[in-house]
Amino acid sequence: MDEPIISIRDLTVSYGGRRVLNGVNLDIMRGEVMVLLGASGSGKSTMLRHMIGLAKPDSGTVSIQGVDINNCSERELMAIRRDLGVAFQGSALFSSMSVEENIRLPLRELTSLSDSVIEIITFIKLAFVGLAEAGKLMPQELSGGMKKRAAVARATALDPEILIFDEPSAGLDPIVAAELDELILFLKRVLHMTVVIVTHEMVSAFRVADRLAMLYKGSLIAVESKESFSTSTDPRIRQFLDRKPQRITESETVQRRMRELVTMRGVSE
């Protein structure tokens, strides 16, 4: 049986006494596209931060290629991070650098390659995402879709085995989002990358995913194929798929807040 390229075990995280992730277990297999779904506040971003080693959990482990990233040497962690390409929400391009300078940065900082080789790799990466003519432009001169593509070029500069996207379709119109989805599938097919996508955009999720995992209030409630996920009868999943708002109960807290609002507006009950 294939070993997972990323293995998360009993991951528990709290902030300010509030439990954000509650004993999450997840295996991501080599070469698959795993989409992590969940409403705002479900723990998606927290899980991503721990997956790439930007924070340490209260308990539990995150292993990449068999190495526990919270219990390894600095040298091992650096090697692991070189195998991780991350395209953050909002692209996170350096505004003071041209597009090609953004792509060159990890190559110059993390390799001993010559300038001429770096130039060739930079051009190849930009051409790969359809930005061969945009290298001299500044990030502020790019459209939203072009910024996302430039972020992908930078994330793949070191030829990582794992590519992680944080809300890749955020802020994009449907046509540009579909083009980005096609690029993600192209990366998987041609470069045989393992892709992890954190999103709440269902159209893109079902377009690219091999499997989907769903977080609900800090707990992982489903890890399923697209087909199984779309036909799930779990009410929490159905609510998310059908875009139905949560029903507000008539609790004492809600009633008290309503009375406060009425008083503030000077309206008698």
What kind of feature is each model-predicted range?
Residues 69-85, 115, 229-233:
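ABC ATPase NBD coupling module
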Residues 97-105:
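Short coil-to-helix segment of the ABC ATPase nucleotide-binding domain corresponding to the Q-loop/switch region
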Residues 52:
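Helix-to-loop junction immediately C-terminal to a conserved catalytic motif
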Residues 157-161:
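A short, proline-enriched helix->beta-strand linker immediately N-terminal to the Walker B motif
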Residues 138-142, 146:
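Conserved ABC ATPase signature
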